[in-house]
């Protein structure tokens, strides 16, 4: 079967934003204008197409990234038909993991900002994530009809707070209730969308006289930004020649794809103005799969050679599973991005991370929650497979004859835990099944059993994250459960360096056990995790026993040394030891490694680490003193203060998570409900002695 749309007319994009910037409404309009939904769904009514889980429709926030495919040929039908694969991502801080894994498989993004509140804390997080994966962006300043909307102020904030070179290609005509349309600064014409057909048609008009000067000034900035794309254009511009519309567009496209500039558009999705022009910008300025560097991975050979997979149907098949979702009708859906090659239904593929073969039973393309069956998937496509048995988020799927492992995604450690218990015996098994499925879907959600109390502990990225997990267990799996008080996920590490002996000997007639190791235990760099170095020379310990020592140390690290919390950032070097021809076994060396680590870590100045959160409080000036005083009482460190709009102040602080429980209620009562806050995980830092002592005593009592 030949390719329907050439790969240069593909756009894989995400729509990302802060929680209330109007992202889902923007996506709804995209579906409406591209002819995929005949009735516009409103978030206000709980009827939006992309928000397909019940919790999303109730809370009015998007939780899972629904993937959808649509076609667009331009507002004026000026292009060939382009295929746009869109992933709608959540904006709430507790779901940053969803955003992160979507950005990993996208080629470009539309970042939506609210015209009145501008750059908010979550926008910065999303922006940093997009920087991390080098995703080219176009900005859409939405809600231009809202009170206090100011397009140029938001552009200024993007430059200042996000450090981006932001170049407007639109200028708004009127704002707040007088918002009428936009000026296209490349064509230097006003666009007037027709209200009678919900903006499906439009007319070009002259620029209003009062905006002529401002539009010309902004156009000069835009042409200068385009001219910087190449020496030839710069020479032409400096010699006073006009750049053609075609030259400007190609230059802006090149600089956007290179992440040198970010183009800004504006409008109001709710009022059906502007989204149509954003779709044009996606086609004109965001990359096709072949315009971005080919994805890299490592081959399945001795040296783990680096290799690339270009966006080409002829290349061997390689794809990345970026999301697992449970569908009530078909079971598990594995969303994947095909980077190279072609795969057909019924084909066998290989998962190098799990070292297993999988078979593609059925392949579907999703439109929010409607499915279209596909026979094949080609380079550049985003689709979902049904019937894959053992695939988790971030796994590679590839051609069994050309094995490659694409780089995996990093997932943040959960910072908050709660105990859950089923209400009845009948719910016990159902709960285990439900938690297993939810953990497979979401890598930032972990489930484990507390060995002492036997309780099931679930951990996640924040209180809302865990609320929604408990809610989903009730609705999707009919499991009723009781929930305990939230607990903080503490960690431990060491500050000193020691050499230590670990010896496990059992010799009492018959076959005994003998394992003997010498280890150097020292701190590793922050964030570097656990590192095991084998420095055994001359066969002091046979090769086959060394992985067991590593395993024993690793298992002991999970149990901690101070208060039973997992140990982070440690480097262990195995440098000597001895063995017994008959009595040595893998088990004996595993126990010796574990004993050595427990003894050594206890001597290497162990300390307790607590999660610190980056907190941003937005408050009217009158309550500023109260807010700062309260954060100080919570062991917070005030990092800075900024001015918001209309007498609003923004306080930036780092505060230990343990001090932030119940903060929203306290903040509301202290400021008569007028202040709001957001927080996200920042890092693990050493807990003060008095705090550490209280936690250790509580764990040991």
Curated annotation (Swiss-Prot):
GO terms for molecular function: GTP binding; GTPase activity; guanosine tetraphosphate binding; translation elongation factor activity. GO terms for biological process: ribosome disassembly. It comes from Pseudoalteromonas atlantica (strain T6c / ATCC BAA-1087). Residues 8-290 form the tr-type G domain. It is found in: Cytoplasm. PANTHER family: RIBOSOME-RELEASING FACTOR 2, MITOCHONDRIAL, TRANSLATION ELONGATION FACTOR G-RELATED. PROSITE patterns: G_TR_1 (PS00301), G_TR_2 (PS51722). GTP binds at residues 17-24, 88-92, 142-145. It comes from the Bacteria. One of its GO terms (cellular component) is cytoplasm. Catalyzes the GTP-dependent ribosomal translocation step during translation elongation. During this step, the ribosome changes from the pre-translocational (PRE) to the post-translocational (POST) state as the newly formed A-site-bound peptidyl-tRNA and P-site-bound deacylated tRNA move to the P and E sites, respectively. Catalyzes the coordinated movement of the two tRNA molecules, the mRNA and conformational changes in the ribosome. Belongs to the TRAFAC class translation factor GTPase superfamily. Classic translation factor GTPase family. EF-G/EF-2 subfamily. Gene3D superfamilies: 3.30.230.10, 3.30.70.240, Elongation Factor G (Translational Gtpase), domain 3, P-loop containing nucleotide triphosphate hydrolases, Translation factors. The keyword Cytoplasm applies. Its main location: cytoplasm. InterPro entries: EFG_II, EFG_III, EFG_III/V, EFG_IV, EFG_V, EFG_V-like, EFTu-like_2, G_TR_CS. Pfam families: EFG_C (PF00679), EFG_III (PF14492), EFG_IV (PF03764), GTP_EFTU (PF00009), GTP_EFTU_D2 (PF03144). This is Elongation factor G 2. NCBIfam families: EF-G, PRK12740.1-5, small_GTP. Keywords: Cytoplasm, Elongation factor, GTP-binding, Nucleotide-binding, Protein biosynthesis.
